Amino acid sequence: MKQTDNIEKNKHKYTGNRLKHIISSLPYAFLSLFSKRDKKIIVFSAMHCETFDSNSKFLFLHFLNNEKEFSPYFVINNDDLRQKLIQEYGEHFIDTRTKEGKKLAIKARTWIISWLDTPLEGMFLKFRRLVIHLGHGTPLKGLGMTEKDGKLIKKIYYLLGQTNISYSLASTEFTGDIVRRCIGFSKKHILVNGQPRTEVVFKEKKQIEGIQDDYTHVLYAPTWRQYAKIKLFPFQDFSLQKLQEILEQEKIKIHIRFHPAYEEDIPQDLLRLENISLFSAKKYTEIMDYLNIFDVLITDYSSIYFDYMLLERPMIFLPYDLAEYEGTVGFTIDYNKYTPGDKPNTFEEFIKCLLNAKNNPETYTDSIKKLNLFLNSLDKEPCKSLTTFIKGKI
């Protein structure tokens, strides 16, 4: 199946699921306007109310472990995942496809979301309720109201979403303007605070199989394109044999991470190399939990590099189709100005950049530090400051 076919299939799937959720939620959303709120109940949700990840996950865990006066719940409308999470964390996961789940969501004084998907669908759901949209990272590519290929129906969806959200999170004043333009908000609805997901970057590294301390570990995380398959090592002079020789000689391992739906698109001849492996999004679902184990990041347009900048480690950018991507998707900022790292055009240049990243990791440190002031909050405990804000609003 072609990548574009996969994308369309997923779009229809999520559109259908969202439509069902909206229809089944409407009576409860209306009832919600008049129901009594419980200040101690906080309901969290992530993508399509089906995943346990991103900013919502990390703030939820903070409340669960540290704020004992609150009753946090996470919406997981996926039976298998919900049961797995209940076994791990306890009875803190609800299904808003059920009457019981809907009723609990209605009672909550506070909703925390990472996408625009709310625990219940509807309009004006922020009425007598605090609804904070945390997002799932600082947007680099055109998103929402700034998408170059955005359809009218999607823009309408974002306009409707505005009626449900009290505040949308941004790491800095600078990125606040980006978020404001993407969602179509006014400045007064932007909450400047560090992102909960970045807190884990400063914690102790996880010990996982295949990550040895005597190697330089590189995360290669390109972003998917709607218009074409991803080209790995996109150089005309690329040599598979030479790549393996260099990696083996220099004790470098490259870990490739794709969107989970397209991992099968990774060329098998690459994965057969001893020093290249798949860092599967299916196995390692939350990349933030593992970001600090990597010494170098290779990407193109993935906003993961904003988070990686907090580590002040070297990055290599491979924007091989920059003009096409900018024309089709667009960017929220000047790409070349705000990407502090080498951008090789040939395989020979790439090898030089890779070795420089290994042997001279401080090359771009000053540039990264300066850009961090614009792109990232340097708060190492953003969950605490966000919790203080929430308590002050309810």
Tell me what each language-model feature is.
Residues 1-49, 54:
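Membrane-proximal basic amphipathic "stem/tether" segments
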Residues 273, 303-374:
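Catalytic binding pocket for nucleotide-activated donors in carbohydrate/polymer assembly enzymes
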Residues 94-110, 260-306:
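Donor nucleotide-activated moiety binding/catalytic core segment of transferases
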Residues 41-202:
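Active-site and donor-binding regions of nucleotide-sugar-utilizing enzymes
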Residues 53-64, 190-192, 196-269, 344, ...:
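Conserved catalytic-core segment of nucleotide-activated headgroup transferases in glycan assembly
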Residues 2-15, 347-394:
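C-terminal amphipathic helix plus adjacent low-complexity
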Residues 39-40, 129, 215-218:
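Nucleotide donor/acceptor-binding cores
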Residues 111-118, 122-135, 139-142, 285-328:
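A donor-sugar binding/catalytic signature common to diverse glycosyltransferases
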